[in-house]
Every structure is written in C-alpha cells, then in structure tokens.
C-alpha cells in the first residue's frame, strides 16, 4: 500500500510542511521508522530520538514544529490520536471473520441474531439472547440467557457473558473476560459458616467500552453493576457487585474495586489500585499506582499512597521520612553529649 502524504493530511485535517507528494508505505515508532514510513512525536523525553529518526514524515504538535525544521511534518493538535487514526484507516490488520453462524455453534430458542453477525465455532448462545447487527463472536464464547448485545460489538475467544447482561454498541471484549458472575456476597451464619446471598442483579455496559483480557465484572446483588460510555478497562481488573464506573474513565491493570463503590467520569485508576466498598471517586480524579483508597476522593484530586492522600502531602511526608536518618544521627550525638555532661556534673 502506498499513500501520498497529502492524502493523509486531508484525512486528518492537518497542515503539511514539506513535500505533500511523498509516498507513505507504512507506520513505525521513531527509532525504527524508515524513509517511506510515518511516525509521531509527543514526548520531549524522545527529542533526541526524534531528531535522529529516518522517518519519511512525522506527526507533531504545533509547539514542536521548530525543532524539526526541514523535515516533512503533519501539524496536529493531537499527534497521538491522529497517528492512531492513520493506523486504523490504512494499516489496521485486525482479522474479522465472515458473517454467518458456524455449524458447531449451539444456539438456543428465541434467539435473535441480526444481519451480518458472525458466530464462531463452539459458541454457546442460550435462550432469549439478542445479538444486533455486525457483531462478531469469536470461537468458544458463551452468552447467557436473555443477554442483549448491541451493534458492531467484538467478543474475542472465550468471553463469558452470564444471564441478563446488557451490552451497548461498539463494545470490545478481549479473551477471558467474564461479565455477570456472582458478586462476593456471604452473610455470616455462625456456627455453620456463611450463607450465600443470591446475586439477582445484572450488568450494564454502555457504548464504546473496551474490556481487556481476564477481567471480571460481577453482577449486582440487587440492581445493576454499570460501566459508563467510553470507559476502558485493562487486563486483570476486578469490578465488584453494584459498582458504577462513569463515562470515559480509565481503569489500569490489576485494579480491584469493591462492591457498591461509585467512580465518576474521566477518572484514572492506575495499576494495582485497591478500593474498599461504598466509596465515591469524583469526576476527573487520578489515583496513582498501588494506592489504597478507603475514603471518598473529591473531583479532580490527584491522590497517592496507602492509605491514599493528596500527592503533595504524600511527597512532603516522604521527604520527612528521608530526613529521619540524619535526624537520628543528630539525636544520638545529642544523647552522647548529654551523657558526657552528666558524667562531668557527677564528678
């Protein structure tokens, strides 16, 4: 495939610097790109790498254009996004199977499968399921009774949707995702042990959500567990029963969210964050990696640590800890001098 740089610029709505007729035959990171390949630059950490790059053209922000004088450039207000748009438009190699239901798939009664859907080998679709247009189920997926799948969804192999799950449009679920399993609900019943609390709720996943490998989203005990429009959930995340995640939030790998916690819009939970149950995280908040959250977090706060605290407070506390060794030396010296004085006075 060969595309003129001017075609890419027109598609993106970007200004060009340099020869717009230059051919682009591929995409690559800065340090690997060759003369016919397109790359992008957003992070000044890689400035030296960018200057040495052999890329045929680079997508850059307006504030960075001067350091690339003489290079072929596309000037963008969001270089990373626009690079992704180019990849999606011309270089996306994602495999999509042909429409149809594989003969080994098991389809229950009263199932509605719309046009142009693809149901892969050994999928199991229980009674009363609705699958809307252009949705793809790769092999070995399970869809529980009365589940609804929206249009243009993509379920990779071994995705499990238990009963009464509701999935919006353009949702992507990666291998091993389990949605709608029982929440962790057990009533103490001594001396016998615990009585299992029936989990009779469901899960609602809004449009444009992506959930990556081996993540579990539990059904509500009563009522729904909800994931808001456009939110992205990484690998190995646990979402407890009746959790609500707002729109366009980012949940990074190995996060654990306990039951009934409410997470706002545009929130970021970095890797291995843990949340206790029944707390609220305000819109736009950021929780840094490995933080432990046991209380509500206000909107737009940046929090860190375990227990979690505002980032600046945490940095001051760490600075004080780093001074303790020197302080300990001073205290020991004072103790030594005091001992000498006491010995002198006793003579």
From Swiss-Prot:
A GO biological process of this protein is:
lipid A biosynthetic process
PANTHER family reported in the protein's UniProt record: UDP-3-O-ACYLGLUCOSAMINE N-ACYLTRANSFERASE, UDP-3-O-ACYLGLUCOSAMINE N-ACYLTRANSFERASE 1, MITOCHONDRIAL-RELATED
Catalytic activity, reaction form: a UDP-3-O-[(3R)-3-hydroxyacyl]-alpha-D-glucosamine + a (3R)-hydroxyacyl-[ACP] = a UDP-2-N,3-O-bis[(3R)-3-hydroxyacyl]-alpha-D-glucosamine + holo-[ACP] + H(+)
Pathway(s) the chain acts in? Bacterial outer membrane biogenesis; LPS lipid A biosynthesis
Name recorded for this polypeptide: UDP-3-O-acylglucosamine N-acyltransferase
- Asked if the keyword Repeat belongs to this entry, the reply reads yes
Query: Which family does this protein fall into?
Result: Belongs to the transferase hexapeptide repeat family. LpxD subfamily.
**Molecular function GO labels:** N-acyltransferase activity
HAMAP family, sorted: LpxD (MF_00523)
Query: Which terms in the GO cellular component ontology are assigned?
Result: membrane
**Subunit structure, per the record?**
Homotrimer.
User: InterPro entries, per this entry?
Assistant: Hexapep, LpxD, Trimer_LpxA-like_sf, UDP_GlcNAc_AcTrfase_non-rep
What the protein does? Catalyzes the N-acylation of UDP-3-O-acylglucosamine using 3-hydroxyacyl-ACP as the acyl donor. Is involved in the biosynthesis of lipid A, a phosphorylated glycolipid that anchors the lipopolysaccharide to the outer membrane of the cell.
Which organism does this sequence originate in?
Nitrosococcus oceani (strain ATCC 19707 / BCRC 17464 / JCM 30415 / NCIMB 11848 / C-107)
Q: Which domain of life is it from?
A: Bacteria
PROSITE patterns linked: HEXAPEP_TRANSFERASES (PS00101)
